[in-house]
Amino acid sequence: MRKKIASILLIFTLIIGLVGCEKKIDTGSISGFDDNEEYISMWVHTIENTPEGEAYKKSVELFNKKYDGKYFLDIEFIPRNESGGGYSDKINAGVMSGDLPDIITVDGPNISAYVSNNIIQPLDGVSDEDKSAYLDSIIEQGTIDNKLYALGAMESSVGLFYNKDIVEKAGIEIPSMDNPWTWDEFYEVCEKVKNIIPEKDYPIDMTFPSGETTIYYYAPFIWSNGGDFVSKDGLTVDGYFNSVKTYETVNYFKKLLDNKMFSKTKIDNLFELGRSAFKFDGAWLPNNIKNSYPDFNLGIAPYPVGNNWNKERYTPTGSWAYAVSSNSTNVSAATEAVKWLSGIESGVILSELTGNMPSTYDAYDKLPQFKDEIYSFLKEQLIKYGHPRPKTPAYPQVSEQYQRMLEDIVLNNKDEKETIEYSIERINAKLKRYR
């Protein structure tokens, strides 16, 4: 009987403790918060005194002004460190302690993992009309099992940039976005470039670096070839990661390297210094070129596609998004804040301060840089062909293994089957807990 009473008291104590946690306001500053307002707490992944941090701060200030007397949004800046920790460590600690804020920022590819680990919950009250304001890629990125969990603070894209002077000298005609070069055609284009450049130079400036870059830049080669990384439910890699389409993609990269279409080792600024004709890079490259290489004659071409491309979406997308944590008890208010922070006005502010691409259609119309030839192309590519990265709770492992696979097989000539099957084993080791 004593044990039973003790157990009941323990449970009661835990419940009281949890209730206390729910009511506790302990994030950020509460300056400007009135008792009659509904308090909304938020963590973001950067520091305040950066262009991105300033954009978030300004959007929060505008939200609080618009909803004065109803809501108060309180932002706390928790920067990531070079290894990606810091912010992630804070999130993990918050999960363990039950002390997450109402809103957190989530890198787009990790949304599925956050859902599977019950870190975030579905948004509340986002209508079809609300959704129609966002790019399809934003809604697809944030939707898991037909429920919308996140809305993007921004979007992103990668372009196949080219040196107009070299391309013109080689007699190459750039295809339209809807009729890109196939792999075979792109190889022939690279041969033409190789015939007119010095032997120490290369047609393409590309590498397979560790980190997120490799899957971000080169997943389109898998998708446009009819392949994929995981099943639709994100829980199966066997038959996908090791499919015939994957082997074909790897061998295409090997063909490019073996015929010296790109360098086995990274050469800094190869493209920028006029020593290659093509480079896969993010939407930040044009501005970098303009500032550091003002005489560079820059163009942009569509991503090459598999020889049997079926016109499906395939180009890179994805960036940071806002989500409501599973700890939040005021989901409706938090969702209103998420809609504001990811909306048109906030998107314009973020793009003006950082150069990032907005997540809503109308924001582009308010930004003059997207009338520029290159930025307009990136926008249209994103709208027409943008494809989110693999949606799986084991996304970090999928990303890591894709990079390792390309490095080991293409650059280091390791056995294809052994390398790919090892990758399957590593990803499956993570997926077991979710099946």
PLM features: what roles do these ranges have?
Residues D102-T105, A277-D281:
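Paired acidic/hydrophobic, glycine-rich loop segments that form the ligand-binding mouth/hinge
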Residues Y187-K192, G227, D233-K264, Y303:
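Glycine-centered hinge/linker elements that transmit conformational signals in sensory
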Residues K65, G69, F77, A170, ...:
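Extracytoplasmic/periplasmic substrate-recognition and gating elements
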Residues I111-V115, A283-F296:
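A ligand-binding cleft/hinge motif common to bilobed small-molecule-binding domains
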Residues Q141-G142, P294, A301, S351-R404, ...:
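Long, aromatic- and glycine/proline-rich binding clefts that accommodate carbohydrate-like moieties
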Residues V106-G159, E168, D184-V189, Y202, ...:
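Hinge/lid segment of periplasmic solute-binding proteins
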